[in-house]
Amino acid sequence: MNRTMLQGKLHRVKVTQADLNYEGSCAIDQDFLDASGILQYEAVDIYNVNNGQRFSTYAIAAERGSKIISVNGAAARCACEGDLLIICSYVQMSDEQAREWQPKVAYFEGDNQMKRVAKAVPVQVA
């Protein structure tokens, strides 16, 4: 049996641009892609913290160090400049591999300042 597991996550990045006329995708600072293990052209799911919208697109690289998060094409209708997003990619693996798997999670604050990168999502407590 295969399982679909979280591979990489950008937690609470801020949209810097929403460009309806660009041909689709989500442009992401190359440093952010590297930190999360998300590859250019990889499918990503995006969760908008501000409005609750959830949508899928693919990642493209933005200039390294630019702090750009640009939601493009039709997806630009789902996010506005300043919105906070969670961007995730997933991977399929065997049940055995999944039991040992740890995703790469990059956490952000302010104007896309990466504050830390972790190899797991913390346990939620009461």
Curated annotation (Swiss-Prot):
Top class in the EC scheme: lyase
Cofactor(s) needed for function: pyruvate
Pfam family membership, one: Asp_decarbox
Enzyme Commission code(s) on record: 4.1.1.11
Coarse class of the protein's main subcellular location: cytoplasm
Active site per UniProt: 25 (schiff-base intermediate with substrate), 58 (proton donor)
GO biological process annotation, one example: alanine biosynthetic process
Keywords recorded for this protein, A-Z: Autocatalytic cleavage, Cytoplasm, Decarboxylase, Lyase, Pantothenate biosynthesis, Pyruvate, Schiff base, Zymogen
Residues binding substrate, per UniProt: 57, 73-75
Post-translational modification: Is synthesized initially as an inactive proenzyme, which is activated by self-cleavage at a specific serine bond to produce a beta-subunit with a hydroxyl group at its C-terminus and an alpha-subunit with a pyruvoyl group at its N-terminus.
Signal peptide: none
Cofactor binding annotation: Binds 1 pyruvoyl group covalently per subunit.
Compartments it resides in: Cytoplasm
Residue positions where Pyruvic acid (Ser) is found in the record: 25
One MF term in the entry's GO annotations: aspartate 1-decarboxylase activity
Enzymatic reactions: L-aspartate + H(+) = beta-alanine + CO2
GO cellular-component term (any): cytosol
InterPro entries in the record: Asp_de-COase-like_dom_sf, Asp_decarbox
HAMAP family, A to Z: PanD (MF_00446)
Quaternary structure note: Heterooctamer of four alpha and four beta subunits.
Family: Belongs to the PanD family.
Biological role: Catalyzes the pyruvoyl-dependent decarboxylation of aspartate to produce beta-alanine.
Record-linked NCBIfam families: panD (TIGR00223)
Protein name listed in UniProt: Aspartate 1-decarboxylase
Species in which this protein is naturally found: Erwinia tasmaniensis (strain DSM 17950 / CFBP 7177 / CIP 109463 / NCPPB 4357 / Et1/99)
